[in-house]
Each structure stands twice: as C-alpha cells, then as structure tokens.
Amino acid sequence: MEGTLLRRYGGFYYVESEGRVWTCRLRGRFRLQETVFLPGDRVEIKPVGPGEGVIEDLKPRRTCLKRPAVANVEQVIIVFALREPPPDLELLDRLLFLSGVEDIEAVIVWNKADISKQEYAGLPELYRQIGYRNLITSAHTGQGIDELKALLAGRLSTFAGPSGVGKSSLLNAIQPGLNLRTGEVSSKGGRGRHTTRQAELIRLPDGGWVADTPGFSRLDLPAITREEVAAYFPEMEPLRGRCRYASCLHRKEPGCAVVAAVEAGLIIKHRYEHYLTFLAEVIARERSFS
C-alpha cells in the first residue's frame, strides 16, 4: 500500500498510510544502494506486523528540494521577520530564485508584524510589485493566521527561512498544542538559535502537510547556465529580447535594457545586485568544471 514518509529517526521510517502511521524499515536493496529517503516521499510499504512495515518502493518525485530536504513540495512558505533578526535580503532572493528553478510556488510571509521596525515596513510592497505573493503575520497576535491556514490547506508545503523569524511559532499558532520548540534571537549578532533539528512532515487540521525544517544561512545555487539566471528574476522577464546584444548578461554591456531599468529605478537595486552575485556564482562553477 502507498503512503507518505513523515520523518526518519535512526533506522526507522514513519509512514502515514490509510489513516495511520506505520513504523517501517528499508528493504535491503535500498540500504545497499544507499538510497536517500526524504520527508514527503511517496513510498510503497508492506505490513509485517501490527503498525509495522517494510518500505518496498520509492515513487517518482514531482519536486525535490535539497535544503530544506523535502520531496514533492507544492509550495514554499518563506518566512522572514519584520524586526529581529534583520531581513537578509540576499537569502530571501536566493530562496525565491531556488523556488523558481524548482518550479515550486513561493509565498513570502513577513512575521512579527506586531513589533515591526519602520525601516522594514516597505519590504512586503516591494516584493508584491515584483509579482511575489506576500502575507503579513504575527504569531503573537494572530494577525494573518487564518489566511495562512487557508494557504496551507490541502497542499504539501515547506517552511523555509533563517532561524529566529518565528517559523515554529507560526506552526504552533496554526495548530495549537503542537508545541514545537521555539527559539529566541541571540543577542550576539541578532541571529536566531536553531530549534528544529531535522525535517519532518506535520499533518494540518484542515488537511495537507507542512514540513518543519532546520534553519540555515547559506544555500548553493542549482546547476543552471549563465544564460538562464535572469529568467528567474520576474522583473527582468518583460525586458527579454530588448538588449542590443542577444548574448547580453546584463553586466553593463552597451545597450542593456536591464541596466537601463535599474538606473531608471524600475528594477530594485538590491535585486539587481543579487542577480549579479548569483550570476557570478554560476559562472565560477561553469569554469571549475571546464
């Protein structure tokens, strides 16, 4: 019978199938092949005892995120705080970029709205104008929680973002009694303390799954070509084909429509700077393999 892998603990795999959770082990061939199973994987299991089973097969994945490591995700809920820790916009743009490459819908959730700093108040509108879906929340006051519940219902979602922004607090607000560990922001450097150790799927009361995942601070870009980078910046898409040179990479080439848009204030400066950062990383990797 088919089920969904919730989590792994040691050599045991916990799979939900037919309304119950089965404690499973892997078939020997998977151990020999060193197959990596991820939360969200659809698997075929064979019962071998009361509540116990063996994983017989791994179904093809529709999507696969490396970090957070979750399979078959339908949307990524990217959580940042409007106060502490200060929004790392390069990390935000990197997460949006990766979601685009993986063809997974991204939603930006701006948490801690009840204690937001004025200097960050304009960020949701900036990203809305680019074309990203935004939601403003407060796990403390309940602002935006009903909208977030509706967004998650019936879908497999993952929460991503740095530690300390309130991912676990939001999940606790969505499903009271979940009692996920929550972290405070460290006074040293304003970084959040990690409170989630490994990814696991959580069944939501209105249907659907959410992956509670570890915090992180660095993500490598996927294996794409330098020509593809701009395609994952939505604000650059309308300018495709308008540069003087077809091979333009938008790095100060003569007649570059993207550079002109940046200078005219039509493209946000930090977004363009992050495009150049990602482009440089992709080019460096291409050269390392040439």
UniProtKB/Swiss-Prot annotation:
It comes from Moorella thermoacetica (strain ATCC 39073 / JCM 9320). GTP binds at N111, K112, A113, D114, G161, P162, S163, G164, V165, G166, K167, S168, S169. Belongs to the TRAFAC class YlqF/YawG GTPase family. RsgA subfamily. GO terms for molecular function: GTP binding; GTPase activity; metal ion binding; rRNA binding. This is Small ribosomal subunit biogenesis GTPase RsgA. It is found in: Cytoplasm. Residues 62-219 form the CP-type G domain. PROSITE patterns: ENGC_GTPASE, G_CP. One of several proteins that assist in the late maturation steps of the functional core of the 30S ribosomal subunit. Helps release RbfA from mature subunits. May play a role in the assembly of ribosomal proteins into the subunit. Circularly permuted GTPase that catalyzes slow GTP hydrolysis, GTPase activity is stimulated by the 30S ribosomal subunit. Keywords: Cytoplasm, GTP-binding, Hydrolase, Metal-binding, Nucleotide-binding, Ribosome biogenesis, RNA-binding, rRNA-binding, Zinc. Its cofactor is Zn(2+).
